[in-house]
Structure formats: C-alpha cells, structure tokens
C-alpha cells in the first residue's frame, strides 16, 4: 500500500499515512492521457505557412501550354516553385486542444499521487506556511527534506508563502484547488498540508 510520510513541526518524519488502496490500482494510461492533453494546451500555435490562396502573385500563366519543350505551368506560385506556396504546411488555425473527461483528470491525479507515495516522496505536514515571507526560510524546508525539487501544496495559499517560494527555481507552490497530475508528476517530491491532502482524498 502507498504510504504518505507524515512530518512534524520540525519537518522530521513522525509517522506514515495510508493512501486509499484504489489510487495505486488506477490505470497509468489515464495519467498519460492527462499529461499529453496538458502539454498540448501549452502549445503556442505560432507556426504558419501560406497556401495557394494566401500567396500574392502568380495569376499570369508563365508561358504557353505547348510548344516550348518544357514542363507545363499555370502559375509561378505553386509549391514546386521558389517563392511559391507551401503544400499542407502548418497554419495558426490549428487547435491543439485534447479533451480529457473530469473523471479521467481525477484518476490521473490519484495515480500520480500513488506513484509519489510508492517512491516515498509524498510528504504531509500540518502547516507549510512561511510567515516571514523570506526565501531563505522556504529554501530551508527543501534542504531539510533533502529533495532535489518539490511541489508545495497549500490548503489556502497566502501571499507571504507565495513570495517566499517564488524565487526558488526548484520549487513551485500552489493552492490545493490548482494541483493537477502534471504538476505532481514533474516534481521529484510533493509536500502537502494535511488539510489539503484530506480534501483531495475526500473527493475521491
């Protein structure tokens, strides 16, 4: 069964909690589909080429149809000509959206949490607030746990905690309402407030 590492006020291991057993039983394909959809939604869609109807010029037939001994041509703007159109090229009208059902999103998050718990890098503590708002205090949390990088999940994200973690390249802090399977997967460790973890497991 997947275990969540419980931390005390000094961020030392104080025990373990069990994640619902069904989390580890979720088909990992749900996680794959969600991450694929999430990354697709980030695409900027800037690649754009001009087709036959978009390029200027080429209205006049360059030479007569027969009698020259060369290949026939009706326009200087076909895709085989230099300066001509592009055949089947990308346009900025393409929509990269990939639909993922609400249930699949939920299952993906459950699987992502189960994977982190199985590796022993899913932590929970009563409070993760940085009341000083200082980056050095936030950095001390990560150093104490000895992890490369971490996703910090707060039940109610306050401004001082956000400011404290914002300058750390190896950390990202989110409110529990914004956490998703991609964020959980991309970080080496996940540290959640106990109330945030309870709200997620209660929904499932």
Swiss-Prot record:
Q: Does the keyword S-adenosyl-L-methionine apply?
A: no
Name the segments for region: Disordered. Answer: 49-75
- What does the UniProt keyword field contain? Ribonucleoprotein, Ribosomal protein, RNA-binding, rRNA-binding
Molecular function via GO: rRNA binding; structural constituent of ribosome
The terms describing its cellular component in GO are:
ribonucleoprotein complex; ribosome
Q: Does the keyword Glycosyltransferase apply?
A: no
InterPro entries xref list: Ribosomal_uL4, Ribosomal_uL4-like, Ribosomal_uL4_dom_sf
Q: Name one GO biological process term.
A: translation
Q: What assembly does the database describe for this protein?
A: Part of the 50S ribosomal subunit.
Family, per entry: Belongs to the universal ribosomal protein uL4 family.
Main role? One of the primary rRNA binding proteins, this protein initially binds near the 5'-end of the 23S rRNA. It is important during the early stages of 50S assembly. It makes multiple contacts with different domains of the 23S rRNA in the assembled 50S subunit and ribosome. Forms part of the polypeptide exit tunnel.
| Cross-referenced HAMAP family | Ribosomal_uL4_B (MF_01328_B)
Q: What is this protein called?
A: Large ribosomal subunit protein uL4
* Protein's gene: rplD
